Amino acid sequence: ALTNYRRRHLGYVFQMYNLIPNLNVKENIEVGAYLSDKSLDIDELLKTLGLYEHRHKLPNQLSGGQQQRTAIGRAIVKNPDILLCDEPTGALDYNTSKEILKLIEDVNQKYGNTVIMVTHNDAIKNMADRVIKLRDGQIRKDYTNEVKIPAQELDW
């Protein structure tokens, strides 16, 4: 039952992209589509991700940001209710990090899924509806942002 729930309702974006090296961008995203009966149109998603022109490239032919966008695509193609992001910008430079955060924000607005993001970057909390801060496995703060800052306006 738990496996079926995860398969149908959850999408995961990892810090390390976990792309399949011998599959191209489109095929890596299609892997996620096979897990759902409510998957999104892959070509439309590739365009949303800014990857349509790169769809036939292998992961080793992509920049870090393109690889992360591919990983995000694989997670959201199955149209999950909840998207879990573990340090989605951890291995990326400042500008690429902001692009990825903007993409996650856009995907959230376009598809209406809940995004749960784990990050050590304190500035990212400003784009969230709700912030839960943990330390040593304990909740230290739990609050709602009255005014969210769009991803493109974040600075760190």
Provide a role label for each language-model segment:
Residues 79:
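Conserved catalytic motifs of ABC-family nucleotide-binding domains
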Residues 83-86:
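Catalytic Walker B motif of ABC-type/P-loop ATPase nucleotide-binding domains
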Residues 72:
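Hydrophobic anchor residue at the start of the ABC signature
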Residues 38-53:
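Conserved ABC ATPase "signature" region
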Residues 1-11, 149-153:
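ABC ATPase NBD coupling module
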Residues 23-30:
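Short coil-to-helix segment of the ABC ATPase nucleotide-binding domain corresponding to the Q-loop/switch region
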Residues 4, 58-68:
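Conserved ABC ATPase signature
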